[in-house]
A protein has these predicted regions:
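Signature for phosphate-centric chemistry
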Residues: 1-2, 6-26, 30-297
Length: 297
């Protein structure tokens, strides 16, 4: 929860004009308890900083059609029976090398029937221990090359199943079309009505990755056909670390023009659009660009 509280605090202080007075904040979440709790931590911190804020929090099933949508074709592509999984399993076998690790941990390593699975499980335990307040690490049971090998397989799967990998033919990023459409509609409504001051969505990393690839956010839509080079083109920890977030910050200039800036994980990023004011873009031009992406059915 501390991750989201700190994010909320930074957002509050970075954009004080948004969260002043009795501003209305609309927050929606996936029905996943984890996502709903993230929404709660984030918005409660905003309320602590300004008790006058009017915050509407919802986690309804009807929002799942855009917050966490995967098309039937996408589900089939990502399934364990998909044709691409055959070459991926060979890639896994090449990169997940458990022999040394098992021998270092167990007197009788041959008793471990699935050593690859054991190594992956230990990898995830080591990774997840970063999320608890223990002054202890399991990473030291691995050699550097072993960690890199397992990560390459994790990264490759995330890239193929969610990002702009040519292997999925754009199928997976297009699962984010409903979410992008909701963003455009919500932005236009807020610009016209002047409310809500902030429109917040709390969802899942895979769906954020798809959205970023679809929008062609800087560094998020790189393409590579060689599985051995996926890690050079796209890195999951850069695109979607713990608490990953995309922020669209809107500004109105003295001529009443609407500008927008994009922050990925609270860092300024660009779109493949020309602008004399980068990282600021004309909202009209951005909206046209994104609407064209949505229209490519």
């Amino acid at each position: 929860g501390d991750v989201y509280k700190r994010q909320a605090e930074r957002m509050y202080h970075n954009f004080p004009q948004v969260f002043r007075g009795d501003a209305f904040i609309d927050a929606r979440s996936s029905t996943s308890l984890r996502c709903a709790m993230s929404m709660s931590y984030f918005t409660e911190r905003l309320k602590e900083l300004n008790p006058g804020l009017q915050v509407n929090r919802r986690a309804y099933h009807r929002y799942m059609d855009y917050i966490a949508y995967t098309s039937p074709e996408g589900e089939k592509f990502a399934s364990e029976k998909a044709p691409w999984r055959r070459s991926f399993r060979e890639f896994e076998k090449k990169n997940v090398r458990p022999e040394r690790l098992m021998a270092s941990l167990f007197v009788k390593p041959e008793a471990i029937t699935d050593q690859d699975a054991m190594m992956r499980s230990l990898y995830w335990i080591a990774a997840d221990m970063q999320n608890v307040e223990l002054d202890l690490s399991f990473y030291d049971i691995f050699e550097y090359e072993e960690l890199v090998g397992v990560w390459k397989t994790v990264n490759a799967r995330m890239y193929v199943c969610n990002a702009a990998a040519p292997l999925n033919g754009g199928l997976m990023p297009r699962c984010a079309v409903p979410l992008l459409r909701n963003i455009l509609e919500s932005a236009d409504a807020a610009i016209e009505k002047g409310t809500p001051a902030a429109d917040l969505r709390f969802g899942h990393d895979t769906h954020l990755i798809r959205l970023l690839a679809l929008m062609q956010i800087e560094g998020c839509s790189n393409q590579e056909v060689d599985m051995e080079k996926f890690h050079l083109a796209w890195q999951d920890y850069r695109v979607s670390p713990m608490g990953a977030n995309l922020q669209l910050i809107f500004y109105r200039d003295k001529k009443n023009n609407i500008l927008v800036k994009f922050l990925l994980n609270e860092c300024e990023v660009t779109l493949p659009l020309k602008s004399k004011m980068v990282p600021y873009y004309s909202w009209k031009e951005v909206e046209t660009f994104l609407a064209e992406i949505i229209g490519k059915e």
